[in-house]
Amino acid sequence: MSQPLLAVNGLMMRFGGLLAVNNVSLELREREIVSLIGPNGAGKTTVFNCLTGFYKPTGGTITLRERHLEGLPGQQIARMGVVRTFQHVRLFREMTVIENLLVAQHQQLKTGLFSGLLKTPAFRRAQSEALDRAATWLERIGLLEHANRQASNLAYGDQRRLEIARCMVTQPEILMLDEPAAGLNPKETKELDELIAELRNHHNTTILLIEHDMKLVMGISDRIYVVNQGTPLANGTPEEIRNNPDVIRAYLGEA
């Protein structure tokens, strides 16, 4: 079996006397879709925050292709190809739709301040490529005709898709989605399912997903990890998780 793209071993996160994440381990292999599920307050988003540099873990290791990530700033982790969305949509609401995608690519532009000031050929080429990527992703998510519309004026489902596109224009290896189906209607959830599958199948993106929509999770995941009160409870295929009595008691039985 190939080495994992991302390996998390014995992850711990303590806030004062509260142990929010307790000995969580998981692996992501290239082009997998893996879900992290559990009841509200189980520590799922805290795990995401540790993996993406928002929190410095209290203990454990996080490695991307065997390079340690724990303690690195979030911007550096993003430049290494690990990006995320949030439970609550975080867009530059006063910017246009396409400006959101251009700003997202700023850290990836391989031109310096001097080149930018002089508008060198290399800078203009990088800007043109960024614009092309933005337009390509807006067309893919059906928002190209809204490119110059203010992001805050989009419908909620469109804002969700724009947030995913904002991640994808940076050409990540790993995309972490925190409750992407929250607030979506059934039609929008089906479109999200199709989009996630396309990201893996056609863009070679590895995906880690937090989600409460069990139909979506069971239908799209290769493997599932379950946490409860910050502690690992189970992991396995969707079928194994669906039939695990501990999981049924702790989480699925609540639905």
Curated annotation (Swiss-Prot):
SUPFAM superfamilies: P-loop containing nucleoside triphosphate hydrolases. ATP binds at residues 38-45. Disulfide bonds: none annotated. One of its GO terms (biological process) is L-valine import across plasma membrane. PROSITE patterns: ABC_TRANSPORTER_1 (PS00211), ABC_TRANSPORTER_2 (PS50893). The keyword Nucleotide-binding applies. It holds the Pfam family BCA_ABC_TP_C. Keywords: Amino-acid transport, ATP-binding, Nucleotide-binding, Transport. Residues 6-254 form the ABC transporter domain. It comes from the Bacteria. The keyword ATP-binding applies. One of its GO terms (cellular component) is plasma membrane. InterPro entries: AAA+_ATPase, ABC_AA/LPS_Transport, ABC_transporter-like_ATP-bd, ABC_transporter-like_CS, BCA_ABC_TP_C, P-loop_NTPase. GO terms for molecular function: ATP binding; ATP hydrolysis activity; L-isoleucine transmembrane transporter activity; L-phenylalanine transmembrane transporter activity; L-valine transmembrane transporter activity. PANTHER family: CONSERVED COMPONENT OF ABC TRANSPORTER FOR NATURAL AMINO ACIDS-RELATED, HIGH-AFFINITY BRANCHED-CHAIN AMINO ACID TRANSPORT ATP-BINDING PROTEIN LIVG. Belongs to the ABC transporter superfamily. This is High-affinity branched-chain amino acid transport ATP-binding protein LivG. It comes from Salmonella typhimurium (strain LT2 / SGSC1412 / ATCC 700720). The lineage of its organism: Bacteria, Pseudomonadati, Pseudomonadota, Gammaproteobacteria, Enterobacterales. The gene is livG.
